[in-house]
């Protein structure tokens, strides 16, 4: 039988709920006390939350706007190839590179001599006071080959040095400094071609200039490196210093006391002393910049001398630093372990000299070096020197380890006299791609007129030591050549300047650019040794995949 309480609960189900509600009401004050004890979110906390979400929304909105609404700035689209022609002109063995129009693509500067002013120039030879023909300088866009600026600069040019480095805080523009054959000495703005300064030469018209113009640290405190010009008259070599920003002579001319007859080099010893090095027949002569500066200004507050070098020079009657086994032909500074070393090429041998004590590190004997060596990387981050040994059909390309002189690679590659120099470009694997010029058909070269012989451009990479890639064939007379990284890590190309072989016979002058990667698919694969299992197309694909990087 059902209990009375259960029966009542079944008949009046809400009655118990009312009792529970009353019990809960009785406990309400305690609950409210507990709620009052709980922390209530402050206004500052709410403001922080609102600020956070507002900032997040703004950031997302900005990202959206930058990504989808505002277009990216137009990047100049570099053409794979272009060509610029000048009729009835002659040109010079000179190419300079730099970003003239500041579009992050390298541009090309060159010289040509023309009777008529170009359509790209607003000034003629007569406007600048020259008779026709006169020498023009032109800056050409590396992007598409358009002329950025062009103007007549001299009656004829003997020497030119472009893009003189300036300090960051200097107000002096980078410049091209030109020395004319008939007495002019001037500098023009690298970016606009406008004249920065112009003066007559300070030495006799019978004197010949010893190239190149040497650059010395700032003497007159104007923030620009200054210039040292050496000239030879008779048996005497003299030098003069000029301000890099104004062109005015600093002091007077002074004799070096040597009978040098070749290209001068400025060398820095381990102590930081600067010396002018000159080939003197079968010897190497040296003069301290400090000593020359003291002679021409009467002051000795700039530069320093190296005691050990002064001892070597004082022991010689004619300021000879060392004697060579043959006539000194080329001299160049190369990176050493603790500073600059010297690579000396004579008519008998090639040797690397320690940059401080001039002791040979290695010697390559019985050489007949065709032209000034170049540097590259055969192994990753390890410098190699490229030597073109022999002449004409007997020429060999030698790659030597710069630090030890050991042979890394060699290959016969016949050429004709006057062929363009070799060059190299660093690749992404920290090696170098090397570019050599040679004869397309050495067998028939002896039977052909040199003017009808084709020069071939060959490409070599150390990862494929048994392969040469023939990229192009050129029958025109090549005046200047260089391989250039026009955009960092984007594309490499070669620049070719062709023109008449004689400056007395005007003709067609052409400046051309060709992208290396676009030449690879149509190239000819030359196997130097047996055993390569890759097909020619696979080899071309490997060359096409090469990526290039800047040296610095």
Curated annotation (Swiss-Prot):
The gene is Fam234a. Glycans are attached at residues 116, 119, 314, 473. It comes from Rattus norvegicus (Rat). Residues 71-552 are extracellular. Residues 1-40 are annotated as: Disordered. InterPro entries: FAM234, FAM234A_B_beta-prop, Quinoprotein_ADH-like_sf. Residues 8-22 have a biased composition (Basic and acidic residues). It is found in: Membrane. It is a single-pass type II membrane protein. This is Protein FAM234A. The modification Phosphoserine is found at residue 21. Belongs to the FAM234 family. Keywords: Glycoprotein, Membrane, Phosphoprotein, Signal-anchor, Transmembrane, Transmembrane helix. The chain crosses the membrane at residues 50-70.
């Amino acid at each position: 039988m059902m209990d009375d309480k259960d029966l009542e609960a079944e008949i009046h189900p809400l009655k118990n709920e009312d009792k529970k509600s009353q019990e809960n009401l009785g406990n309400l004050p305690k609950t409210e006390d507990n709620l009052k004890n709980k922390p209530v979110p402050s206004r500052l906390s709410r403001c922080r939350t609102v600020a956070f979400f507002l900032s997040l929304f703004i950031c997302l909105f900005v990202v959206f706007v930058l990504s989808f609404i505002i277009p990216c700035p137009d990047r100049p689209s570099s053409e794979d190839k272009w060509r610029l022609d000048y009729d009835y002109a002659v040109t010079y063995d000179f190419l300079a590179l730099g970003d003239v129009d500041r579009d992050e693509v390298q541009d090309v500067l060159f010289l040509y001599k023309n009777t008529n002013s170009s359509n790209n120039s607003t000034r003629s030879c007569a406007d600048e006071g020259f008779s026709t023909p006169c020498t023009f300088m032109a800056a050409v866009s590396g992007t598409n080959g358009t002329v950025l600026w062009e103007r007549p600069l001299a009656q004829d040019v003997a020497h030119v040095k472009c893009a003189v480095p300036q300090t960051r805080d200097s107000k002096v523009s980078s410049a091209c400094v030109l020395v004319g054959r008939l007495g002019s000495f001037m500098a023009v703005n690298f970016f606009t071609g406008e004249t920065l300064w112009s003066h007559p030469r300070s030495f006799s018209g019978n004197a010949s200039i010893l190239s190149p113009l040497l650059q010395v640290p700032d003497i007159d405190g104007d923030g620009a490196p200054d210039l040292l010009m050496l000239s030879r008259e008779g048996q005497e070599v003299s030098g003069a210093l000029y301000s890099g920003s104004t062109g005015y002579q600093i002091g007077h001319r002074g004799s070096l006391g040597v009978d040098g007859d070749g290209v001068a080099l400025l060398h820095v010893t381990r102590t930081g002393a600067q010396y002018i090095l000159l080939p003197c027949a079968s010897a190497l002569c040296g003069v301290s910049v400090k000593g020359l500066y003291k002679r021409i200004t009467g002051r000795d507050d700039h530069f320093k001398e190296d005691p050990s070098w002064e001892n070597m020079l004082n022991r010689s009657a004619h300021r000879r630093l060392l004697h060579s086994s043959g006539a000194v032909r080329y001299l160049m500074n190369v990176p050493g372990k603790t500073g600059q070393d010297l690579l000396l090429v004579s008519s008998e041998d090639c040797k690397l000299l320690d940059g401080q004590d001039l002791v040979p590190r290695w010697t390559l004997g019985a050489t007949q070096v065709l032209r000034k060596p170049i540097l590259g990387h055969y192994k990753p981050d390890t410098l190699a020197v490229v030597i073109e040994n022999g002449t004409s059909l007997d020429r060999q390309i030698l790659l030597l380890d710069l630090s030890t002189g050991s042979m890394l690679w060699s290959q016969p590659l016949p050429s004709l006299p006057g062929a363009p120099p070799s060059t190299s470009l660093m690749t992404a694997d920290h090696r170098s791609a090397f570019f050599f010029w040679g004869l397309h058909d050495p067998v028939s070269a002896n039977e052909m007129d040199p003017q009808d012989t084709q020069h071939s451009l060959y490409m070599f990479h150390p990862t494929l030591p048994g392969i040469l890639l023939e990229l192009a064939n050129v029958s025109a007379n090549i005046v200047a050549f260089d391989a250039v990284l026009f955009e960092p890590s984007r594309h490499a190309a070669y620049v070719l300047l062709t023109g008449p072989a004689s400056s007395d016979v005007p003709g067609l002058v052409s400046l051309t650019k060709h992208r290396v990667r676009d030449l690879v698919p149509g190239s000819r694969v030359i196997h130097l040794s047996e055993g390569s299992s890759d097909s020619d197309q696979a080899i071309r694909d490997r060359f096409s995949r090469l990526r290039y990087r800047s040296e610095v």
